[in-house]
Amino acid sequence: MHPNCGDIDELRRIIEEKTKELSREIVRVKEVGTTSPHGIYIYDAKNDEWALVQRDGDYFKPFMNGFYVIYFDNTKCPACRKYDKDWFPYIREEGRKLPGYCFVIILCEWFAGMCKSEAASKSFKHYDIHASPTTLLIYHKDGKIIYQEKHEGYLTRNELRTIVGDFCNRALKAERGEKVEPPRRRIEDELIVLLRKLLELGGKS
């Protein structure tokens, strides 16, 4: 356990209290999918379930100090269904073990304009989400967002390990005022390799 990444037991306790506070009858699912009600889901690591905690009201706000990983999901998004195949196994097998992390899914049909959940729609608008899937990472402390990253598009499981797993360290580094460079995406690495090859070929001609 990273000594500075928060108390996972305390986070779980707050999550459990929050789910009770925000919804009288909590919808719980093993995985959020195309037939799931639109709204804001929080992962309950203890029971390996996603709890629908909010459908009405304002946009999602971090509710305690910690590291938030928010997946903006659209039911009409084919890339989201591909992402699900890496996202859910990663959370279940690896993400749930990360101390101080809170995993969230915000589900609509098609962004803010086609959504049966007021809270989810407002969340898409507030966080300026225009691509799906989008994974937003937030470090929240003392009522403020200290550091955040937005990753648009499908992430592989290896990318999730790098981007999510090490977010804690990048966020704490940013808090100390140190320069932080978010990890490059796989496609960016592939483009760099391709450009280098093209430059090498151009130099030989």
Roles of regions detected by a PLM:
Residues 87-92:
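Short amphipathic alpha-helical segments
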Residues 183-205:
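Short, low-complexity, charged amphipathic interaction modules
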Residues 72-74, 97-118:
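Thiol-based oxidoreductase modules, predominantly thioredoxin-like and allied folds used
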Residues 1-59:
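N-terminal "domain-start" segment that seeds a small globular fold
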Residues 62-64, 127-131:
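Extracellular/periplasmic catalytic domains that process cell-envelope and extracellular macromolecules
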Residues 130-188:
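Non-catalytic, surface beta->alpha helical segment in thiol-disulfide oxidoreductase systems
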Residues 60-76:
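Short active-site neighborhood of thiol/selenol oxidoreductases, capturing the structured segment around
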Residues 72-86:
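Conserved redox-active cysteine motifs that mediate thiol-disulfide chemistry
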